[in-house]
Amino acid sequence: MIAVIGCNPVINSKEEVDRTTIVLPTEQEELVKRVAAVNPNTIVALISNYPYAIGELEKNVPAILLSASGSQELGHGIADVLTGKAAAAGRLNMTWYRSDEDLPDMNDYDIIQGKRTYQYFDREVLYPFGYGLTYAAFSYEKMQIKKERGCIKVSCFIKNTGERSADEIVQLYVHKKGSRVQRPIRQLVGFERIHDIQPKETRKVTFMVQLWELEYYDVISERMILEDGTYQFMAGASSQDLSLIHISEPTRRSYI
């Protein structure tokens, strides 16, 4: 059984409408509970263009499939994934928090002091930025870093350890250790979708990180600065599933 819930882009998720809560509507929560009580194998298809706090919902069903509004082909796409004709491989482009209490005031746009987004939020979340499951499993191996002119070359290998082919979205993050200013806990500097990886197959993934991507704007000197010191590169399946870590020390530079 499939319970379809969520929002409608022309009714309650229009761009000019701000939500006062990230809680799922009570009626939808109750619907899923009642359906799941009759059939414990009920799957939820959540159609949403923004995050919900669905921690309680997660406890009542074995699987949740998320899709944004997909126009007239939405139903066909969901059906193909649920029947195994296609393997889901999407990733969250937003952090999904556990409750309203995890968020600052709606009018507070300071992402650093308000600890907004995966870059600064330091508590447990429901689903992290970049998260997503598929019908296969992948392992990450052998991260390598090489300095080149004006950039840092980062490569790693991923292996399909599952029993069917699927896509994997490899994500690369960086963190500046010991910065003299407040920098993100981690910052996305690259991602790549690797298509149709067969069972037991290994693929190499390479990122070219430009040095300017590691810089920040210094308000005192009024220029972009690349700090000396240690930069931690992390690769994995989401912002909190980073199985490969490597250290690099790029050459300092600054310019107006």
Regions found by a protein language model. Name each.
Residues 47-167, 173-175, 183, 199-201, ...:
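Secreted, periplasmic, or luminal enzymes acting at the cell surface/secretory milieu
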Residues 213-230:
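Short glycine/proline/serine/threonine-rich loop/turn segments at secondary-structure transition edges
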Residues 19-21, 60-61, 171-180, 187-190:
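Active/binding-pocket-proximal capping segment
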Residues 181-216:
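Intrinsically disordered, low-complexity Pro/Gly/Ser/Thr-rich segments with frequent PxxP/GP/PP motifs
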Residues 236-244:
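Beta-sandwich strand segments
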Residues 245-256:
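Single conserved hydrophobic/aromatic residue that forms the stacking wall/gate
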Residues 12-18, 184-185, 217-218:
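Short acidic, glycine/proline-rich loop/turn micro-motifs
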